[in-house]
Amino acid sequence: MLLCQISDLHIKSRGENAYRVVDTAESLRRCVAHIGSLPTAPDAIVITGDLVEGGHADEYALLRELLAPLPLPVYVIPGNHDERSAMRQAFADQPWMAQGGERIEYVIDAHPLRIVALDTVIPRRGGGQLAAESMAWLDATLAQAPATPTVVIMHHPPFATGIGHMDQIGLANGEILEPVIARHPQVERVLCGHLHRSIQKRFGGSIASTCPSPAHQVQLDLRTGAPQLFVMEPPGYQLHLWTPDGGLVSHTVAIGDFDGPYPFD
């Protein structure tokens, strides 16, 4: 199975740029076209939060329009820029959206790789938090299929990254997730967003990772007190290839017009 992950789209109202600089709609158009041109088509896409910038209905409508050229299942979770009720309405035609209660949490059993979605959002806050009820649900859900390879998807990564201003709006209680993941070795990866960069950490006997944005990236500055900046580094997304013999292998894909490809001989 080939699973595509995109994250932190930050779609604005039609014709508006994010932070007055970033044409996020055009960025997503290029990303969708790039995914559509892959020599091997993904089997599904997960979008790990911050689908839109302001949580408005018209932003979600534009998002659905931009994703429409992709003829494959798309599964989404909220980020801190999303608004749950507007997001539910925008994806009301998707059966998985009806699984959760207050939070947008669900499980997908339609693929060789099981997908379990967690909601880390605190409304109107940049940082996130895991609910005790979510941890109980996750533990029980993972226990139902101990032999099925699984990815857990969530917006805020459950670890500090060293990028101070992002860690300040990180996951407040990520440590409560680690023993749950450790109890279920079928979890191949915890796939996250929020950081607008590709970052990995060993976590609960598995790997937790973040995905770059198809739009703008967070400036990599590990100094204490570094300013809050973004940079127009090459946009990207990730491909996660699952095979029974090889397990889960992840690739970060850059979006752009680059020279080549050239033969090695």
Predicted regions mapped to residue ranges:
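Short glycine-enriched, charge-decorated loop/helix-capping segments at active-site entrances
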Residues: 17-23, 124, 163-170, 224-226
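Active-site environment of divalent metal-dependent phosphoester hydrolases
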Residues: 11-15, 53-58, 80-88, 123-126, ...
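His/acidic metal-ligating clusters that form di-metal
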Residues: 30-44, 127-207, 238-239, 246-248, ...
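N-terminal active-site segment of His-dependent metallophosphoesterases
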Residues: 1-62
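Active-site-proximal beta-strand elements of phosphoester/diester hydrolases
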Residues: 1-13, 112-122, 151-153, 206-212, ...
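Binuclear metal-dependent phosphoesterase catalytic core
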Residues: 22, 180, 202-265
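Extended active-site neighborhood of metal-dependent phosphoesterases/phosphodiesterases
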Residues: 57-144, 176, 182-186, 212, ...
